[in-house]
Amino acid sequence: PGSTIKPIVALSALENKIINTKFKVHCKGHKNPLELYGQTYHCWKKEGHGLLNLREAMKQSCDTYFYEVARRLGVDKLSETAKKFGLGEKVFNNLFDNEKSGLVPSTFWKKNALGKNWLLGETIITGIGQGYIQTTPIQLCLMTAQIANGGYKIYPKIIIDDSINEDDKFQSLVNQTNNIKIIQDAMFSSTNELRGT
């Protein structure tokens, strides 16, 4: 999914009290990349973004910021939040035979599926939507809609008739409503402000 995963990474870090809105990371682009076990991780912006808080990092889609957030958060907490928002599972619950569930990786998943331990570098790249993580377009729509609606679970359906489904209840997906507002504002800034990506 690439950078479309960044709102969930940020929300998960806020919900787990790993960061707050004042948490800053200095992005130096290609000048001083993060080096870990022989791998180099740098931002997409060659000259870097400078010192960024959450809102600015989301607006400018700074990879360096999200590497650090993912590193602090850990893949298991990120996985838990992503699954709450519908990633890693079929959206229409067997309505379509060819719908894919995608993949939200975790330490348990890798050990169980591949027989290997999870690596810190894998957490870092998961923070920018790279590596094992896989999503479908409808999952990303659902994730975004649930952020936009204030963090409430949506049960999408194909409308056959207009009867009301009693299963449609307002189930909050977040611990603190302020966290979802922070993410909404950052997403808005990405598309509506100068330097937004």
What are the language-model segments listed below?
Residues 1-3, 8-197:
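Beta-lactam-recognizing serine transpeptidase/beta-lactamase-like catalytic domain environment
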